[in-house]
Structures are given as C-alpha cells and as structure tokens.
C-alpha cells in the first residue's frame, strides 16, 4: 500500500519521532511511504528586531535554516516544501492512505481529492493550547469526516469529554527498544534525577526544576541532568549545577536516561509523554504527574504518580526514591524496564495497520 504523512515541519519533537518510526515500520513491511512537510518558519520583522535588541545572534543566524529533524534523520522518503504554506494536491502523490498529524494539516488534507488516499487523522494532541483563538478551529478539525486514531486513552477521553463520541480508536505509542535500552545497574554513586527541559510552560520544566531545588533541601548532594531542544533560558531557570545537554545526539539519549536514578515528568498538557517510556526502557523509574499515558504506564508499582502542579509532592517523591535501599530501587528499575519492553513499535505498527484495514 501507499502512505503519505503530512507534517507542519520536521523537528525533534516526540510527535515527529512517532511519524518517523511509523514511516520506517511501514517501509520495512514493503509499503511505499512519503512524508511531506513545510520548510521552517521564518522570523517575523518584529521577532527580528527583538532578536537584534537582545543581541540574540544565534536566533538570527538560524532563521529559516533547517535543523535535521526525526524525519530527515530516519532516512524515509521526504518532501520539504519551499516555504511555510498550505499543503495542496500538487504536493502529494496518489496513495491508499493519507495521514494528517496536526489540526492544520488535517484541514488541508480534508480539501484533497479522494485519489490522494483515504483520510486518516493520527491524533497526537488536543491542540487547543496553541492560542485561545484556535480552539474553535481545532474542534472543527477534529469533527471532520475521516478515520481517527488517538495515541492514548487519556487523549481520547479528554477530547470526547469536550466534543462527544467521535468513533476514535486508540493505538498507543511504544518506544524504540533498539535505541532505548540499558543493562542492569545499581543506584548512582550520587543520587541523580533528570527531566526534559523546554521553555514552553505546558511542558512543566519549571515544576521539575522547582521540585529538584526543594528536594536538595533534604538531599543536598542531589545531581540534576536535563536535555532539550531549547537553549537554557533565564525565564525558565535550571537548578544550580545542572548538567544540561541542548539538542544532544539521538544515540546520547539512552546514556542520559541511564545516568539517573529517577526521571521526572511534570507536563501541564501532554497527549502521551514519550520520555516516560524512553526512561523506563533504560531502567530508570519515573516520577510523573497523571498526564498523557502516565496513568496507564505507572500503575502497579512501576513508577510514582504525583499531583499536578505540585513541585512539593514531586520533591517528596524524589527524596523518597533517593532514600530507597539499593534492593528496592533495583526492583523499581526492573519493573520499569519490563513494562517498557512488553510492547514495541512493531506491535504498534501492527495495530495501526489493523485499524486501517478494519475501518
């Protein structure tokens, strides 16, 4: 079969990683795959003036210059449009299925002729967080007639509580078990926690950072590790002496996860939370808020769930994990690893194909 995926851009976000992996999985099964995405957004005149006033030369130099995203790094066939614009029929080949992964690309997909493939909305988030004005457009996009597949039961529930039943199936994300894995290990010599750093408030890096600072009041030797696509910003400060990796190489990620005794997930809004699974696959227990797939993944003693927006509760969980005996921590580590490895991207791709074929 022939598949076309539509993306607004190629970046190193979790959502783009999911598309890249599905494209690889489908290609490995003998299907024809193409990913179509726009060129990077350019700075507006106002943004350029602000960058000059702030002497942010790196932002000016990077304006419009593409960083290799997950699609480019995956090696799957890719078509990059010349500039940020709507995707039209002339941009995509005829196919059996065409998959939109963002509300705007879903609207664009809806306008395409039937020859471009049966329309599929791979729902990776409830994107009302973009701007308050976008809510009506996002909801309208979700109501368009197409085959809908959500990446978590939490996301399906959140959307259908707002919009009513949408005949939506669920195919959970998995983790690349060849990329994310680690041998058994003991606790670190100095207690160490990590989290994904991002400036966007919805990602909750400020909650994780504050939790680390509070935990250090009781565990002064606590080490903190973080990585992210955003450079460190004074508006979202990292804890003192954080080992921070900006845009680390993909093969470096498992080392970062495996260097920690616990991984923190504090998102205010997330449709899944791939770092939870990635850390677990590297034998690192996770302390998380009940957002995205966290509730499904961290039950039965696999990890620790804490209240939303509560750095105090997250800090208490950090302290408790730091004070665990070596044997108890080892048990948590093995449970996390086992949970992450019970379901693979191969399984997810099989479920995706089954959903498409049965529809």
Placement of each model-derived feature along the sequence:
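Conserved donor-binding/catalytic core segment of Leloir-type glycosyltransferases
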Residues: 147-150, 185-203, 209-216
């Amino acid at each position: 079969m022939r598949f076309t995926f539509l993306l607004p851009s190629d970046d190193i976000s979790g959502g783009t990683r999911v598309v890249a992996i599905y494209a690889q999985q489908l290609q490995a099964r003998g299907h024809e795959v193409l990913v179509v995405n726009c060129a990077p957004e350019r700075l507006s005149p106002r943004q350029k003036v602000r960058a000059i006033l702030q002497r942010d030369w790196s932002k000016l130099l990077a304006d419009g210059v593409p960083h290799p995203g997950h699609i480019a790094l995956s090696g799957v066939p890719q078509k990059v449009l010349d500039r940020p614009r709507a995707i039209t029929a002339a941009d995509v080949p005829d196919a059996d299925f065409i998959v939109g992964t963002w509300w705007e690309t879903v609207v664009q997909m809806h306008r395409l002729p039937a020859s471009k493939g049966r329309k599929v909305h791979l729902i990776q988030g409830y994107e009302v967080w973009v701007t308050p004005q976008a809510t009506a457009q996002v909801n309208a996009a979700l109501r368009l007639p197409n085959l809908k597949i959500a990446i978590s039961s939490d996301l399906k529930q959140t959307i259908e509580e707002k919009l009513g039943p949408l005949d939506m199936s669920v195919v959970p994300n998995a983790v690349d078990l060849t990329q994310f894995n680690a041998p058994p290990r003991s606790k670190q010599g100095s207690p160490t926690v990590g989290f994904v750093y991002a400036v966007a408030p919805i990602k909750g890096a400020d909650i994780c950072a504050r939790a680390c600072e509070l935990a250090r009041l009781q565990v002064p030797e606590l080490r903190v590790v973080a990585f992210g696509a955003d450079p460190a910003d004074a508006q979202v400060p990292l804890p003192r002496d954080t080992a921070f990796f900006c845009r680390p190489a993909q093969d470096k990620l498992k080392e970062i996860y495996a260097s920690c005794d616990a991984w923190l997930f504090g998102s205010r809004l997330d449709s899944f939370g791939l770092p939870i699974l990635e850390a677990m696959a590297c034998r690192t227990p996770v302390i998380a808020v009940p957002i995205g797939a966290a509730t499904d993944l961290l039950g039965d003693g696999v990890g620790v769930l804490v209240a939303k927006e509560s750095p105090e509760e997250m800090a208490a969980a950090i302290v408790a994990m730091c004070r665990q005996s070596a044997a108890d921590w080892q048990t948590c580590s093995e449970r996390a690893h086992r949970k992450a490895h019970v379901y693979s991207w191969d399984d997810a791709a099989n479920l995706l194909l089954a959903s498409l074929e049965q529809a």
